[in-house]
Amino acid sequence: MTTLSPLTADDHDDWLSLWWGYLEFYETELTTAQTELTFARLTDPADAVYGVIARDDDGQGVGLVHWLTHPSTWSAGPYCYLEDLFVHRDARGSGVGAALIEHVRVWAAASGCDKVYWLTQRGNEKARELYDRVATDTDFMHYEIDLATNAPGAA
C-alpha cells in the first residue's frame, strides 16, 4: 500500500533521489542551490509551495508531487497548478501517480480552488494515459519566455 505524507526535513534524501530522477526524465539540470531552495520552500509551512512524498510498504520513496495556487482572472476562486509529478520507474502503473493527483485534487477542493491543472510533454505517453483518465486535455498550447536568456532590452 502506498502512503502519502507532506514533505518534512526528514524526507530530504528520499525526495532528492526522486527529484534527480524527475530532472533526468525530463533531461534537464538545476543547480544545487535551486534544488535546495525548492526543498526549503516545500518544507516551509509559511511558503505557498506544497509537496507530498509517496512511500511504498518498505518506506522507500516512490513518488512526489508539488503544487501551488494562484488567483485567476477567469474565476472567483484560485487555481491549483500541479507543477511537478514524478513516480519512480519501478512503481509506474501501480496507482502511485493517480494517488498523488487525487491527493492534490482533494487538497485543492478543500482549499477553495476552482481548478487543478498541469502540463506534460506531448511524448510522455505513459503519463498521458493516466492524465486522460483523470482530467481533460484542453488542447491549449504552452508558450514561455525565458527571462534569463531573453531579458527585456537584450539583443
Enumerate the predicted regions with their spans.
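A short, internal acetyl-CoA/4′-phosphopantetheine-binding micro-motif in the GNAT/acyltransferase core
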Residues: L68, L85-R92
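Conserved acyl-CoA
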Residues: H88, A99-K115
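A short beta-loop-alpha structural element at the N-terminal edge
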Residues: T3-S17
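Conserved active-site alpha-helix within GNAT-family acetyltransferase domains
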Residues: A98, A110, R122-M141
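Conserved beta-strand in the GNAT
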Residues: I53, Q60-T69
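Glycine-rich acyl-CoA binding loop
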Residues: A54, G93-A98
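A short helix-loop-beta-strand connector motif used in the catalytic cores of GNAT acetyltransferases and
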Residues: R41-I53, Y81
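Conserved GNAT-fold acetyl-CoA-binding loop/helix
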Residues: L16-R41
